[in-house]
Amino acid sequence: MRIGIVTETYSPEINGVALTVAGLVHGLAQAGHAVQLIRPRQKSDGPAAAIEERIATTLVRGMRLPRYPGLQLGLPAGRRLRALWKSERPDALYVATEGPLGMSALRAARDVGIPASTGFHTRFDDFARHYGLGALTSLVFAYLRRFHGLGAATFVPTVELAEFLGGRGFHNVVRLPRAVDTNLFCPSKRDEALRAQWGVGADQLAVIYVGRIAPEKNLPLAVRTFRAIQRLIPQARYIWVGDGPARAALEAQNPDFIFAGVKSGEELARHYASSDLFVFPSLTETFGNVTLEALASGVPTVAFDYGAAREYLTSACGRRVARGDDDGFAAAACLLASDAVAFAAARTAARRCVAHLEPATVVANFVRALAELSGAGNAQSAPTDSVDPAAAPRREADESAAVSTAPARAECRGSLPVHP
């Protein structure tokens, strides 16, 4: 199948949307599909469009975002895209981001008769409220309804988000689960030498935060939660992976914290696997890929009950806390960190919570959905569970049941210490 993908952010930019789209693009190519990628030019790009095996990239103009220097909006490119698609027409188009480039791509696809679908990756209404722009929420949703209404379907990663958008006038919202690379994110990547660099011994607790270090990530609760853990386990250390506008102040106020900077690929996997507890208090995620990465790495996780946590984080592998319950969040993290039996069981079970989210399975479901929307019945996709927006996510059969201690997937298993 020939699939066009339009996105305003892409690897090596480091954010959830960029990494999700890049994983999808390469998964499609590996499955034998021809991918036409349209994205803004990045600093690392040469003067010509890139050509990879089964991936043809068209670069367009972009504009940097204030306060987010690592991100940019793609500028409208409708005329160029119409010309491109008249000569190199894809069977289906997927528009991953809702900026000017995405809007122009949807209109161009409509003009030349290419079936298009969209992805809902970012809760812009949450960002607007966080930055004191809540009065703009109705305008934001009006734009988003118009944008996604130009596509035949809108793909979302969770049942929760599908129901949320359906209640706000979005039509044909389809749940498509996210994937996690369980070969990359793996307990066997645990590195005692890295822990030694952090000043963490084999029997000490390393708490980790991974993500943008920015005000919208609820960082005061992260600090408060760790300090509560530290009162119970004085030798605990807090590792921060990422960067952002709040880092300098956070570092100055907490000189005992370890700031590792931005990590990706194998380095990121080593940091996850070398930690012991992932504490993620953000309330502004559309999904939260980091939750899947931590669980795949065998790291028990504490997060609020929405997004990826609601879909995949069970009491077997961590703790979900009601949104906005800051006291409950800190208490849950403390109880898990200080209960040796529960902690050991969660470490054993964490990877199993996401082991079924194989990239190849998610790609096959994506292709099947595009084929149905475009009428391309000859699309080649392996037999998989159908994409069903109303289907409940896979969960442990009974979250209150005793935790099984059966080993996680054997191909990626490492030694897992017990704390405290």
Where are these regions (language model features)?
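Short alpha-helical donor nucleotide-sugar binding micro-motif in glycosyltransferases
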Residues: 85, 262-263, 270-275, 366
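Short hydrophobic beta-strand element within catalytic cores of glycosyltransferases
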Residues: 300-303
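Aromatic "clamp/platform" in nucleotide-sugar-dependent glycosyltransferases that forms part
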Residues: 283
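Conserved acidic donor-binding segment of nucleotide-sugar-dependent glycosyltransferases
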Residues: 164, 315, 319-326, 335-340
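Conserved donor-binding/catalytic core segment of Leloir-type glycosyltransferases
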Residues: 200-227, 347
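Donor nucleotide-sugar binding/catalytic pocket of nucleotide-sugar-dependent glycosyltransferases
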Residues: 39, 61, 141-191, 200, ...
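N-terminal subdomain of nucleotide-sugar transferases
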Residues: 1-59, 393, 399, 409-412, ...
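Nucleotide-activated donor-binding/catalytic signature segment of Leloir-type glycosyltransferases, i.e.
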Residues: 247-267
